[in-house]
């Protein structure tokens, strides 16, 4: 999902 691709361990609403 977008969080993994963006390298962010939080929810997509927070990171993306």
UniProtKB/Swiss-Prot annotation:
This protein's UniProt keywords: Disulfide bond, Secreted, Toxin
Q: From the record, what ranges are coiled-coil?
A: none
Q: What GO molecular-function term can you cite, just one?
A: toxin activity
S-S pairs: 2-16, 3-12, 8-15
Tell me the tissue specificity.
Expressed by the venom duct.
| Cellular compartment(s) | Secreted
Gene Ontology CC terms:
extracellular region
Domain of life assignment:
Eukaryota
The keyword RNA-binding belongs to this UniProt entry's keyword annotation: no
The domain section of the record reads: The cysteine framework is III (CC-C-C-CC).
The similarity comment for this entry is:
Belongs to the conotoxin M superfamily.
Entry protein name: Conotoxin ar3e
Identify the species of origin: Conus araneosus
